[in-house]
Amino acid sequence: MVQRGSKVRILRPESYWFQDVGTVASVDQSGIKYPVIVRFEKVNYSGINTNNFAEDELVEVEAPKAKPKK
């Protein structure tokens, strides 16, 4: 399961960011169809750099980095 801060690869073929890697900004637990918000480095034609995806449209590439202990 993806979590905030994970690096994910996009598997949705009609997406501008298909096969690109982005960072998970948030995951909604309320039961909506596209609960995962992913932020990308590059922008699409409209100047947008985030999009919502379903969990089955994502593959986790890298787990989030652990926060350093104080």
From Swiss-Prot:
SUPFAM superfamilies of this UniProt entry? Electron transport accessory proteins
Q: How does it sit in the membrane?
A: Peripheral membrane protein
Alphabetical UniProt keywords: Membrane, Photosynthesis, Photosystem I, Thylakoid
Q: GO CC annotations?
A: photosystem I reaction center; plasma membrane-derived thylakoid membrane
Which InterPro entries does the entry link to? Elect_transpt_acc-like_dom_sf, PSI_PsaE
Q: What is its main location?
A: membrane
Question: Which biological processes are named by the entry's GO terms?
Answer: photosynthesis
Query: Where is this protein found?
Result: Cellular thylakoid membrane
Give the superkingdom in one word: Bacteria
Record's function text:
Stabilizes the interaction between PsaC and the PSI core, assists the docking of the ferredoxin to PSI and interacts with ferredoxin-NADP oxidoreductase.
Which family is annotated? Belongs to the PsaE family.
> Could you tell me what this protein is called?
Photosystem I reaction center subunit IV
Q: Which organism is it from?
A: Nostoc sp. (strain PCC 8009)
Taxonomic lineage of the native organism: Bacteria, Bacillati, Cyanobacteriota, Cyanophyceae, Nostocales
